[in-house]
């Protein structure tokens, strides 16, 4: 994902803090 480059386990969603 272009938004969350650290975690790509999520879909193309807005910048949201997912699980660590």
Swiss-Prot record:
Keyword Hydrolase assigned: no
In its record, the post-translational modification comment is: Glycosylated.
One MF term in the entry's GO annotations: calcium ion binding
Q: Where is this region: Disordered?
A: 1-20
Q: Does the keyword S-adenosyl-L-methionine apply?
A: no
The UniProt keyword set, sorted, is: Calcium, Glycoprotein
Assembly mode = Homodimer.
Main role?
Appears to be a building block of the soluble organic matrix of the shell. The protein binds calcium.
The protein's name: Major extrapallial fluid protein
């Amino acid at each position: 994902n272009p938004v969350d480059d650290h975690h790509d386990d999520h879909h193309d969603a807005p910048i949201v803090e997912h699980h660590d």
